[in-house]
């Protein structure tokens, strides 16, 4: 679960 959240956060930051 935490890993998925971190992955999503990283994806959003990369999108910026």
UniProtKB/Swiss-Prot annotation:
Coiled coil: none
Modified residues (Leucine amide): 16
Protein name (record): Alyteserin-2a
Protein keywords: Amidation, Amphibian defense peptide, Antibiotic, Antimicrobial, Immunity, Innate immunity, Membrane, Secreted, Target cell membrane, Target membrane
BP GO annotations: defense response to bacterium; innate immune response
Annotated GO CC locations: extracellular region; membrane; other organism cell membrane
Signal sequence residues: none
Compartments in which it is found: Secreted; Target cell membrane
Tissue expression pattern: Expressed by the skin glands.
Reported function: Shows more potent growth inhibitory activity against the Gram-positive bacteria S.aureus (MIC=50 uM) than against the Gram-negative bacteria E.coli (MIC=150 uM). Has a weak hemolytic activity against human erythrocytes (LC(50)=135 uM).
